[in-house]
Amino acid sequence: MSQGPPAGGVLQSSVAAPGNQPQSPKDDDRKVRRREKNRVAAQRSRKKQTQKSDKLHEEHESLEQENSVLRREIAKLKEELRHLTEALKEHEKMCPLLLCPMNFVQLRPDPVASWSAHDAPDHPSFIWLGTLV
């Protein structure tokens, strides 16, 4: 009949496991040094992980603030667009140029009518005065 561990915990044996020799003081020292080295490495790893987590949290907070600022700017620009669209609609009702039967008004004579499309300057000789959709 085998005996289990005592009521308070683990059964300890002074006999080495089969195939193992009893621990020498030199082996004990190595084991202690290895455990200490492992403990220090684990502390370093946990500290590094905590620092990385803190950095990500700070970056998240910063991005949330930037996002909030950009959303407010978008709302402001949408309101400005709505206001300008309304102003344009009101202006179109009264603009004499839009009531004219011609949709194009020449701003200046075209001095370079012979230019090809790739030679022409960036500014057009004609401007469309119709409504934009």
UniProtKB/Swiss-Prot annotation:
GO terms for biological process: dendritic cell differentiation; myeloid dendritic cell differentiation; negative regulation of transcription by RNA polymerase II; regulation of transcription by RNA polymerase II; response to virus. Residues 51-68 have a biased composition (Basic and acidic residues). The modification Phosphoserine is found at residues 2, 24. SMART domains: BRLZ. InterPro entries: AP-1 (IPR000837), bZIP (IPR004827), bZIP_sf (IPR046347). It comes from Rattus norvegicus. The gene is Batf3. It is found in: Nucleus. Heterodimer; heterodimerizes with JUN family proteins. Interacts with JUN. Residues 1-68 are annotated as: Disordered. This is Basic leucine zipper transcriptional factor ATF-like 3. The lineage of its organism: Eukaryota, Metazoa, Chordata, Craniata, Vertebrata. Residues 56-84 are annotated as: Leucine-zipper. Pfam families: bZIP_2. One of its GO terms (cellular component) is RNA polymerase II transcription regulator complex. It comes from the Eukaryota. GO terms for molecular function: DNA binding; DNA-binding transcription factor activity, RNA polymerase II-specific; DNA-binding transcription repressor activity, RNA polymerase II-specific; protein-containing complex binding; RNA polymerase II cis-regulatory region sequence-specific DNA binding; sequence-specific double-stranded DNA binding. Keywords: Activator, DNA-binding, Nucleus, Phosphoprotein, Repressor, Transcription, Transcription regulation.
